[in-house]
Amino acid sequence: MSNKKKILIIQKVHEKGMELINNHPNYDVEETDDTSIENLKSKLKDCDGASIRIAKLPGETFEGAKNLKIISRHGVGYDNIDLKKAKEKDIKIAITANANAVTVAEHVMFVLLNIAKRKDLFDKTVRDGNFKDRNKLPKTIEVWKKNFLIMGFGRIGKALIKRFLGFEMNVFVYDPFVDKDKIEELGGRKVEDLAEAVKTMDVISLHMPLTDQTENLINYDLLKTMKKTCIIINAARGGIIHEEDLDKALNENLIFGAGIDVFKKEPPDDNNPLLKNEKVYLSPHTAAFTDECMTRMGKETIQNIIDFFEEKLEKSKIVKL
């Protein structure tokens, strides 16, 4: 009887990650792209560990998984996993804490400048042969000296603050779980009252998990208090912004624009109003999709599994359940 640990890789990870485990003497590895509940339930019942990308892992997939000890998430969000059931079964959840912070921060920079400088409109104007109409085009927005609010101050938030201070912006941070001193050490200013803070912000970028407390946190009541020149960017989780409320606020010119990388439902339904709103820059949950980042994430996802069974996984990578 083999003493090897059985590992299920749910959805492909970068080949550099697979190289760490495919020929490892302590593991038998199986890959699956079938993310149906029936398949995952069947596959997991004999597994000791698994990795997961964005597929859902509801509690019923853990039924019968008597040996399952670790699920390594390819990313930092974990709202696709039934945490309550994982806790009941003493299954640890690990995240790729170090892989994507810089990449997502760069994406936010790109999206902000794209929206502020009306990149798509200006590009289309030239391509359509309307260069001569340049003086009729709407003006753009500078980011210099503007107020930038980071909502959530984990690794991505810390990567952001370095970059936006380089733009000479005034950086504020909303995170009830981070001490004021930690924020000020990096050049930011902590805000305690979110409802009051958003009234004076020019840019708001979301980097917090989706929880009962953060779901629909950005809603019409909050949006209507923002500056008409405000740009809001979400590269965290879709449910944090109420999508219909955002569409309404944009149509009423309550804010300048939005950058959306994540949706409440992925892929979004065809009738999602944001898909037809030209004031929104959209991307398909690809803020971390650089080759460099995907390599790091693939390697860290697999290394977390190996480190767990070798009892050397960093505690900071394990989700508190």
List each language-model region with its residue ranges.
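An N-terminal-biased, well-structured beta-alpha scaffold segment characteristic
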Residues: 1-94, 199, 219
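Short, Asp-centered acidic motifs that coordinate Mg2+ and/or phosphate
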Residues: 48-49, 70, 203, 231, ...
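Rossmann-like adenosine-cofactor binding region
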Residues: 56-62, 178-273
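Phosphate-binding beta-alpha-beta segment of Rossmann-like dinucleotide-binding domains, i.e.
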Residues: 89-91, 97-147, 159-162
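Glycine-rich Rossmann-fold phosphate-binding loop(s) that bind the pyrophosphate
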Residues: 153-154
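NAD(P)-binding Rossmann-fold cofactor-contacting core
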Residues: 166-184
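Adenosine-phosphate binding glycine-rich loop
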Residues: 268-269, 277-298
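NAD(P)-dependent dehydrogenase/reductase Rossmann-like domain
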Residues: 296-321
